[in-house]
Every structure is written in C-alpha cells, then in structure tokens.
C-alpha cells in the first residue's frame, strides 16, 4: 500500500473515503488539538449516570438542536448539555422541574466558526471557554451558532 508507512494513513481504505476529521494535527515538532478533539473531550469529561427530564418548549419544530440532562453520582453535580448544529443562534424556552431559583453553574462553551481551525501557527484558535454563570432553568437559554454548551451545577 502506498501509505503503509504513515500511521495516520495506514487504515485509509477502511474509512470509505468519507470526510476525514482528525483529532490531532501532527507536525514535525508539534501536535495541535483540533475542534473535534475538544468536542470528544467535552463528551468524555461530562458524563452522568442518571438521566433527567429537561423539557424544551416547542422543540418539535427545531432541527439540529440536542438537549440532554443528568446527574453524576460521583461528583454530585447536575450536567446539562446543549448542542446547536444550526448556523444561527437559537433561543430555547426551558422548563426544568425542581429548579425554581437561580443557581451558580460552570459553563463550558465550544463554538465553531466557518473557516476557523487550529493550525500549528494558531494552535488555540478554537478551544472551549470556561466561565461561572448564574443559571435560571426556567428562563430562556441562548445557544450560539454551531456550538456545544455544558452546564455543571450542584
């Protein structure tokens, strides 16, 4: 095989020539984490063992919006994951029972912009941004275009 000596290309025939989305870009002297690396890391680092009902009003008409909420027994935290695959910002009307007041939450946001990628020259162009916010689960939530947002709270 032509690319047998290259580890990244070794299994090229098994990819069925679909779009190849690497998690790392390996150069001669450096390795750069891509947005897909950070996306996989956000899923891996924010798992839960108890699934909860996080209702979104009028979600039937929304395409490419995904919401899941759960409780992690190990860290004793609630985790809310929101994914917007649309190219425009979306406002969601939430209705989560049992959370009647505002709470402090850790917010992790990964936003993708067309044409903006991590490269060896700009290794941190796309990466998650972490902040502490006040969250009200009975008010509207804004989702940036092409983004994944994770809220962690007690």
Residue spans for each PLM region:
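Short Pro-Gly-centered flexible turn/kink motifs
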Residues: 142-153
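Flexible loop/turn segments at secondary-structure boundaries
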Residues: 15-21, 87-90, 114-118
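Acidic, Ser/Thr/Pro-rich beta/coil linker or hinge segments at domain junctions
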Residues: 99-144
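Carbohydrate-binding surface patches
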Residues: 63-101, 107-112
């Amino acid at each position: 095989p032509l690319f047998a000596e290259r580890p990244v290309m070794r299994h090229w025939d098994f990819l069925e020539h679909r779009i190849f989305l690497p998690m790392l870009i390996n150069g001669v002297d450096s390795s750069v984490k891509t947005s897909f690396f950070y996306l996989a890391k956000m899923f891996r680092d924010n798992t839960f063992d108890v699934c909860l009902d996080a209702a979104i009003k009028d979600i039937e008409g929304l395409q490419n919006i995904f919401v899941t909420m759960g409780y992690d027994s190990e860290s004793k935290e609630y985790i809310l994951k929101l994914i917007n695959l649309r190219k425009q910002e979306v406002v969601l009307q939430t209705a989560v029972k049992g959370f009647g007041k505002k709470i402090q939450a850790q917010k992790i946001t990964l936003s993708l912009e067309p044409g903006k990628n991590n490269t060896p020259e700009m290794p941190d162009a796309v990466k998650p941004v972490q902040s502490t916010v006040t969250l009200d689960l009975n008010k509207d939530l804004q989702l940036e275009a092409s983004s994944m947002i994770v809220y962690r709270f007690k």
